[in-house]
C-alpha cells in the first residue's frame, strides 16, 4: 500500500523558486512510491505579500508603496495568473486554500524554503510550519531543507523553537549555519543538512516541465533581480555589451529603475510578467546568469551556465554562499565593488560534490519514509 505524504510549503507564491521546489520534492517522493499531496495551506502573511488580489496592498500606510501597487496591478495580475496556471498543472490542481490540514497522511514534510522564521510586524512564527497541527496517530512530521535566514535567535524565539522542534520526528535544514543554531534546541535529535529539493531532484525531472526560450535564435545573458540587486545593472550591461550579448531580465516584484533602464538601452528585455516556462527556458539557453537568488543560482548550476552570484550584502547572502562553498564555486560570488572573476567553473567537480550530497539527502528521505 502506498504511503501518503503531504508537503507544507509556500507553493502558491508567484516566485520562480517557491513553485519549483515543491514540484521537485513532490516528484522525488512520487519516485519513492508515495501518494503525494502538496497541501493547500496558504500562509496568511505570504499570501498578502504576493497576491495582487489582496486589496490591503492598495491602501498601505506608505503612499508611495500604495501608488506603485496601483500602477503595477495589471502586470502583477498577469504574472499571478501565469504562475497559477503552472501551479494547477504541476503542483496541485485544486483551487483555493484548505480550511484545515488533512489528517490522513503517513508523513508530513515541512519544507523547503524560508519557513522557520518570523512573519509580520509583530514577528510571529507560523504555527503550521512549526508543526502545531493535528494528525492521525502514528503519523510522522519531518522538516526537509527548511531555512530560516530571516530569523533572530533571541531568548523568546529560542524557547518557541525548542517547543516547536519537539513536534518533529526528523529535522533537516538547508544551511550548516542553521544546523549549528538549531542543534541545541532540538532536544537531542540530530539536525541534518540536506539539499534543496531543486538539487535533490535529478535534472531530467525538470524536463517534464514546459519551457520556452524567451529570445529564440539570439545570444543572451540573464539577470534575475531580487532584493536590491538592481544596482548591478550597469556593470552587467557593460559585460553583455562587450560580449555581444542581449540581456533578459527577470525580477521579484516590479523594479521601476529596471523599466527605465530597459527603455533607454538597446538589447535589454525586461520580462515583467514572465512565468516559470520563460524562466526555465532562459536558464537553459542563456550563455551566462547574474543573480543573488538562491534558486536562480541553482538553475544556472543545473544547466551548467556561466554563473555570477551577486552579493547584495544585506545579511541575506548566506544561502547562496553556503551552496557555492559546497560545490567549490566560491570564486563565482561577486560584490559590486570587486572585479568580475572570469576563471572557468569546474562543473565536473561540482557534479561530483552534488552526487555525494544527493546520496546523503536521499538517505534522509528513505529514513523518513521507513
What are these regions (language model features)?
Residues 1-370:
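Active-site anion-handling motifs in enzyme catalytic cores
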